UniProtKB/Swiss-Prot annotation:
The gene is purM. Pathway: Purine metabolism; IMP biosynthesis via de novo pathway; 5-amino-1-(5-phospho-D-ribosyl)imidazole from N(2)-formyl-N(1)-(5-phospho-D-ribosyl)glycinamide: step 2/2. GO terms for biological process: 'de novo' IMP biosynthetic process; adenine biosynthetic process. Pfam families: AIRS, AIRS_C. Keywords: ATP-binding, Cytoplasm, Ligase, Nucleotide-binding, Purine biosynthesis. It catalyses: 2-formamido-N(1)-(5-O-phospho-beta-D-ribosyl)acetamidine + ATP = 5-amino-1-(5-phospho-beta-D-ribosyl)imidazole + ADP + phosphate + H(+). This is Phosphoribosylformylglycinamidine cyclo-ligase.
Amino acid sequence: MTDKTSLSYKDAGVDIDAGNALVGRIKGVVKKTRRPEVMGGLGGFGALCALPQKYREPVLVSGTDGVGTKLRLSMDLKRHDTIGIDLVAMCVNDLVVQGAEPLFFLDYYATGKLDVDTASAVISGIAEGCLQSGCSLVGGETAEMPGMYHGEDYDVAGFCVGVVEKSEIIDGSKVSDGDVLIALGSSGPHSNGYSLVRKILEVSGCDPQTTELDGKPLADHLLAPTRIYVKSVLELIEKVDVHAIAHLTGGGFWENIPRVLPDNTQAVIDESSWQWPEVFNWLQTAGNVERHEMYRTFNCGVGMIIALPAPEVDKALALLNANGENAWKIGIIKASDSEQRVVIE
């Protein structure tokens, strides 16, 4: 007989019981996201999902993303309830710009030591994002990995699949001289530029929880969840001839708008058509950030830009604003052989 202590997985830092407790905690909110096409429930080796029958030539569209270092700010401020919405938004907004309806979503949650309350708050936020975008949360991976993450740190990633009719894919090929650009207002910095945000907070010595901006803590502005545009944009696509949609994420105006422009076209943005939300003015002032850098790093109050024919503008604005969006005409498309694909004037 040996006197050696018998070791368990829990002794090594992996608590299977905590993982099971998390599954029990989130089952209810996950169930609310279920679409009729989804087969089976949580716990299978894989999730099954049929294609909606309304599509004649369905094309699957997929995307994966994270939330960048906004997660670091969320962890530092111990506010975990909306970061899951950000995660879903970053994925589904990328799908809908191609005309795709999100079908299902999977998440990856990794941590050194699983805190059931924190993980439950994050995944509840993911479920809320799925509800807002009409897609099902069909599964995920919760990885407890001792020694891989410091303290209570965690990381999240998301993966989404959507579907679009082949003949209705939006790829920017129809964009032409004279098209009008419509902006959809953002809820804040969304999930991009947060390494610069955190550097500005560090250099300025500002406490985002005690610094007020427009009558509420700066932290509320910085952690406002990314706006999910899916339902508004899908209705717009059904009723209006949309030529292109750009999701303003990393790279801001300069990098994202050209992704949907054909050769020999240029987007001309009218800077006087909107005022930056105060959080962007604060960031620019506190960090002494140049204007060009602001437009390269942040959305500056614009979450999406939609290109469509001029005769469709009034109808589009009415539809979008009726659905709760802050939408306005922000610019036009011009024929141009310039290497500068976007002009802000």
